[in-house]
Amino acid sequence: MKIGIVLYPTFGGSGIVATELGKALSRKGHEIHFITYSQPVRLDKLRENIYFHEVRISDYPLFDYTPYEQVLTSKLVDVVRYEKLDLLHVHYAIPHASAAYMAQQILNSQGIKIPFITTLHGTDITLVGKDPSFEPVITFSINKSNSVTAVSKSLKEDTIKQFDIKTNIEVIPNFICFEEYQLSNNEKYKKRLAPNNELIITHVSNFRKVKRIEDVVTVFKNISKKLKAKLIMVGDGPERNKIEKLCREYLDHSSFTFLGNLKSTIEVLNISDVFILPSEKESFGL
């Protein structure tokens, strides 16, 4: 099949899952077309059966904000028509599902049939979806999807509770390739981050308030009173500066390290003794 995958190309979970899914499908012989505004961070190289179509965003003096949904819709119409796609798979309800529906209707008027699947990932429902101004669009685009999936049972239940959903939602959990995480020679990397053989405690997130990263610092502070430990912070986001300041204020300067965004977390998770994720809410926890 020729499949178009629409995603956010950033370090967030939905973009990573969408990228890895596309790569896996390409290995099975499907032709995958990623459609987004920049190359996905986990798409390190274009390989056989994988193509990337950039949604170019221009600044128009008339608009205070770039109308990304309309630009994306036009790009979807173009790629479906030119590449003769069989299916669109959109990850994250806003604005991808509504853009896919608009593209579907435009193509339908030209005699081209293109179904689309919407996958719900979490914050598109639990956070963004709570804004009443988005509710009609989210409800409409989910109901108009040819198929809808959610990454967990709890997310499915939240979606049904918050929106007037008339269509079936199938739960398809996120996935991980265990073989990729079986690293044998990681002592050198561990020695660099924990030279005194400290217990390594790791947090990975997009540093938003919902991740409750202040609690990570509090927990680590208590642990470090009794054990030799090292706190590894992976990721970036709006709360990072605040959390860094907190660490400098309450922790020994040699007991924590901020690594920023990593394209792959395989190495750091392999050397970690504890992974801590005290989120207020997670659609797909561990």
Regions found by a protein language model. Name each.
Residues 7-11, 23-68, 169:
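N-terminal strand-loop element at the rim of the active site
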Residues 261, 280:
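Aromatic "clamp/platform" in nucleotide-sugar-dependent glycosyltransferases that forms part
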Residues 181-195:
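A short helix/loop element that forms part of the nucleotide-sugar donor recognition site in Leloir-type
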Residues 108-117, 123-141, 157:
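Nucleotide-sugar donor phosphate/pyrophosphate-binding loop at the beta->alpha transition
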Residues 149, 195-211, 217-220, 232:
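Conserved donor-binding/catalytic core segment of Leloir-type glycosyltransferases
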Residues 154, 175:
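Carbohydrate-associated surface elements
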Residues 62-88, 97-98, 102, 132-136, ...:
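An amphipathic, basic-hydrophobic alpha-helix
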Residues 241, 263-272:
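Short acidic alpha-helix that forms the nucleotide-activated donor recognition element
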